[in-house]
């Protein structure tokens, strides 16, 4: 049965009835699936409901055996951990985006006469918080619109290969308390990261150097968890820059020259000493670090130095002072920007799961069935990684059709 479900994903067939008809017409496909007779639709459905946890265990096993392959393909990208949240829209009556949009327009018309009236929160309060058919299907803001979906966190490496899937059931997030749709999503994202990664690291003893996440994960607790607890460098943009930066710093937490606040000091590495917290070392922007006779020296070219030191001003900033602003890799530096560009690979993975693997077109509203479909999509990707590795065709690991064609 599992072979048939993986084949169904590979062929981008969302409808089980259509897949059954194809199996009835093709003896070759029946042989691949190991069927002498084709199961009916209810047998497929019962399998997904009954064996959802077993499918997850199988997926976790595939994650373990594909990690060395990912490391062999590109060890640098395999040292990068990426997390994104998404939602699998269920086949429920409430999933009509026009309904919320119409309600929001009506509320915005009311707010014209009352500037303190929050149209977004009021519109959300009038919508059912969960689907009548299944309370696990909740009102969410996903993929640019409101819908009723099974919320999911996807974890990948820098290659876009799925490392974990987590179905969070966070009851502490109230979508009606958010002032905007994006704020509602960011609030959910910020609270989902630590539980998701705790589950992931409890199953896999993997080590990562960098974490990439969008601005939704910009929360102090997330920085502390990643850097202090997991020894992972977080690469996360600010959700919103401080309205008034700290004196002597710009909006990204970079110290400025005392004589010219438009002149940013230069990053010069991390200072680590036993018994002291890690510190970011910044040097004068007009000081050049060089090697002379085997020794490191600084050459200062400033005409109006702010210090008598021959190397110019040096500023050591403890990371613990403000772990969100004082990032190990300076925010918006060339290294930070190059790393963050890699984050878009998870968007490709989400797209692949929903469209080439037909997850977006499933007509399901049962929790276990929806979870099984998501897990099967991830299993299919990892099976393709194994096939591509055996075929020495790893450059196409994110293109299922190219690998199996």
Feature roles, as predicted:
Residues 338-405:
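Basic, amphipathic alpha-helical segments enriched in Lys/Arg and hydrophobic/aromatic residues
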Residues 1-11:
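Basic, short loop/linker segments at the boundary and entry of helix-turn-helix/winged-helix-like folds
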Residues 23-24, 215, 248-281, 319-365:
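Short amphipathic alpha-helical "interface-anchor" segments enriched in bulky aromatics
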Residues 283-328:
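Long, low-complexity, polar/charged, intrinsically disordered or flexibly structured peripheral segments
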Residues 180-183, 187-293, 330:
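An internal, acidic/charged active-site-proximal segment
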Residues 32-52:
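Major-groove recognition helix of helix-turn-helix-like DNA-binding domains
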Residues 46, 50-211, 215-228, 239:
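Polybasic low-complexity intrinsically disordered regions
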Residues 16-33:
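DNA-recognition alpha helix
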């Amino acid at each position: 049965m599992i072979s048939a479900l993986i084949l169904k994903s590979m062929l981008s067939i969302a409808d089980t009835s259509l897949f059954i008809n194809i199996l009835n017409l093709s003896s070759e496909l029946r042989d691949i699936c190991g069927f002498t007779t084709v199961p009916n639709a209810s047998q497929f459905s019962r399998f997904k409901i009954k064996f959802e946890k077993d499918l997850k265990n199988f997926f976790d096993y595939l994650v373990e055996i594909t990690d060395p392959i990912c490391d062999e393909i590109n060890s640098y990208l395999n040292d990068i951990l990426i997390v994104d949240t998404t939602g699998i829209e269920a086949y429920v009556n409430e999933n009509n985006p026009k309904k919320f949009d119409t309600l929001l327009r009506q509320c915005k018309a009311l707010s014209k006469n009352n500037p303190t009236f929050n149209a977004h929160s009021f519109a959300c309060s009038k919508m059912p918080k969960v689907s009548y058919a299944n309370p696990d299907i909740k009102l969410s803001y996903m993929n640019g619109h409101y819908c009723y979906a099974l919320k999911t966190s996807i974890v990948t490496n820098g290659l876009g290969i799925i490392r974990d899937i987590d179905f969070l059931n966070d009851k502490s997030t109230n979508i009606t308390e958010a002032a905007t749709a994006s704020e509602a999503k960011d609030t959910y994202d910020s609270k989902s990261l630590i539980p998701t990664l705790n589950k992931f690291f409890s199953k896999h003893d993997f080590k990562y150097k960098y974490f990439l996440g969008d601005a939704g994960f910009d929360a102090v607790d997330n920085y502390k968890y990643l850097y202090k607890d997991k020894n992972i460098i977080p690469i996360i943009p600010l959700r919103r820059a401080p309205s008034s930066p700290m004196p002597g710093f710009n909006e990204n937490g970079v110290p400025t020259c005392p004589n010219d606040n438009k002149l940013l000091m230069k990053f010069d590495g991390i200072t680590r000493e036993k018994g002291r917290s890690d510190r970011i070392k910044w040097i004068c922007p007009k000081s050049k670090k060089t090697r002379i006779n085997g020794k490191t020296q600084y050459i200062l070219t400033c005409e109006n130095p702010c210090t008598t030191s021959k190397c110019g001003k040096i500023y050591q900033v403890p990371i613990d002072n403000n772990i969100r602003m004082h990032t190990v890799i300076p925010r918006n530096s060339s290294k930070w920007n190059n790393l963050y560009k890699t984050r878009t690979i998870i968007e490709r993975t989400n797209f692949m799961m929903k469209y080439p693997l037909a997850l977006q077109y499933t007509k399901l509203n049962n929790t276990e069935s929806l979870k099984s479909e998501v897990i099967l999509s991830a299993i299919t990707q990892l099976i393709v990684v194994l096939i591509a590795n055996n075929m020495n065709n790893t450059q196409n690991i994110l293109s299922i059709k190219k690998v199996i064609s």
